[in-house]
Amino acid sequence: MDVPSSSSSRFSVGSASPSSVLLYAKDLKKWDEFEDLLEERRQVSDFKFAMKCYTPPLYRGITPCKPSDIKSIVLNSEEINYVIKQLSRESLTGVDVLREEANEILEEMSHKLRIGAIRFFAFVLSKVFKQIFSKVCVNEEGIQKLQRAIQEHPVILLPSHRSYIDFLMLSFVLYNYDLPVPVIAAGMDFLGMRVVSELLRMSGAFFMRRTFGGNKLYWAVFSEYVKTMLRSGYAPVEFFLEGTRSRAAKTLTPKFGLLNIVMEPFFKREVFDTYFVPISISYDKILEESLYAYELLGIPKPKESTTGLLKARRILSENFGSIHVYFGDPVSLRSLAAGRLSRNTYNLVPRCIPQKQPEDVQAFVTEVAYKMQLLQIENLALSPWLLVVAILLQNQLCMDFDALVEKTLWLKGLTQVFGGFLLWPDNKLPEEVVQSSILLHSNLATLVKDQVVLKVDSESSQMVNGLVPQHIAFLMCSAYRNQLLNVFARPSLVAVALHMTPGLRKEDVFSCFSFLRNVFSDEFIFLPGNTLRDFEEGCYLLCKTEVMQMTGKDIILTDKGNAVLQFLTGLFKPFVESYQILSKCLLHEEDYFSEKEYLVTARKFTRQLLDQDASQCYDALSSELQKNALAAFVRLGVVEKNKVDSKYVYYVNGPATSKLEEMLGCKKPIGKPATAKL
């Protein structure tokens, strides 16, 4: 595996005078080595593995208790008693009735962690994973750091979320290394799987509703349940910052509800510190790749059921390559808050009284969420297939094999220079690496007479569940390409800004970059308030690859950098063009519309353009992108969002919409950052 060596480079953006401020410095990271834990599993009996002596290290301040004890502690807590009395006065409902309701909520959500269920899953998952994965690779150094952290302070596990099996995989890995299996926040969807949901409960899952609908009692019970487990050190708490799986393989913007809950004991000085552990789970081939494409094209996801699980047994005959699980360094909440946040406001009222979060605390929670996601992204392992599919999507979907290998090697070097965690087998020839990648994804690409062809140019007019096969294949390919964008987002945005800015004055390029970053801030993870630093990072990487040079007030492009610029703008072209298409689509909307109506119209409008060969932008069909675009349109003032009869409706600002479409199409100058909003 090639891993960039540590180095440090610096450059300044701005005046070239001696007094100019050094604005950016970037260190290339060196990652831990991986160990394949399936190697040992293939040598030892699965039953012996499941029944091994399991003595995980415990938090030094642990309060020993059973799952039933946790429920009792929650029901008798000052917080729940206070909320019940408040609600009783407000709703004129008896305290006993509300207490019974709280008990029912707890029965619905709580876990029943038992060692027997953990051993059962260890046995089953060992067999399944050996069948469908070549390797399950884990960085042992990260495991060792986690082992120490678990004994010192309460631990929050924050994995990336790409597949249903993420949480199962994580529990399997922790059991393998004799670490405590976490309690896991799971969606209520799983309750439809009767036997499975009970097994999940007994392996540590606790269930939460997608929305609480203003139910104060539910929120109080749920938050107190999570905080009780955290304060007692019962087990590491695991949840997904994204809230749901990313269907398009890009990290979704974070949800803050659970993060607020687990940070509160620290804010109220109920715990000395809390460790956050970002975990990056990378798949060579995503199990749900076709299911995701269907969902993005408007087909609702199948309801979770035991029958559906049994039907999914067909995946046992497929090869999904390898999984890489990277445990990041534990991050101390106390260290993050030092000099950044005052907890004094929490001393002014009793702990049991719910209080509105101060603005500085809200900003801090938001910042922590984005920082954790950026750490997840930094440690996501990239497979060679991502390079191959990104190149093919920019080369008319077909390419000579030798030319593809040459271009893939070129992109390999660029990815590593940009700081990407690329997994490239050093013991294989480049031709073998590319060929094995194509073979693993033979449902999407094939090698015919020295030509590599993406299987997206189907002549078949036969519909699949009302969908065009070509659209399904394109979105599956796009999902793999999207994984590269985590590494290339900032230099790509600078490249697009350079393309859209006449004259190449640094100030104008920065204005355009700021505008684009704002437009696409729901598509990619950018730390709020970090625009200048993101611009500097993008410029630094383009200077490092000799794409451009910085002078006092201007940017000079080099002939040597044409290939890099062309590739980077090509990576972002689908997003710019998709937002243009959706801007035009808005002008065809009625006076007001719901999100559901917008998605139907957007899909229909885009399909018409594709059918008429007026566009080749298949990414605009993605419902995930369409929702992100709508959020951006609201933020930019292109669309107004109002609540009417408990439902949200949207109104189009016609002139602002036309202006946005013109700006994205380079027909109108962007303007200065202060006036970049529409």
From Swiss-Prot:
Q: Which UniProt keywords apply?
A: Acetylation, Acyltransferase, Membrane, Peroxisome, Phosphoprotein, Transferase
In this chain, where does the modification Phosphoserine occur? S12, S17
Matching entries from SUPFAM superfamilies are given as: Glycerol-3-phosphate (1)-acyltransferase (SSF69593)
Q: What is its EC number?
A: 2.3.1.42
What top-level class of enzyme does the UniProt entry assign?
A: transferase
Q: Where in the cell is it found?
A: Peroxisome membrane
Indicate which residues form the motif HXXXXD motif.
Answer: 161-166
Question: GO biological process annotations for this chain's record?
Answer: cerebellum morphogenesis; ether lipid biosynthetic process; glycerophospholipid metabolic process; membrane organization; myelination; paranodal junction assembly; response to fatty acid; response to nutrient
Motif range (Microbody targeting signal): 676-678
- One Gene Ontology term of the molecular function aspect: glycerone-phosphate O-acyltransferase activity
The UniProt subunit note reads as follows: Part of a heterotrimeric complex composed of GNPAT, AGPS and a modified form of GNPAT.
Q: What does this protein do?
A: Dihydroxyacetonephosphate acyltransferase catalyzing the first step in the biosynthesis of plasmalogens, a subset of phospholipids that differ from other glycerolipids by having an alkyl chain attached through a vinyl ether linkage at the sn-1 position of the glycerol backbone, and which unique physical properties have an impact on various aspects of cell signaling and membrane biology.
Listed name of the protein: Dihydroxyacetone phosphate acyltransferase
Give the organism, scientific name.
Rattus norvegicus (Rat)
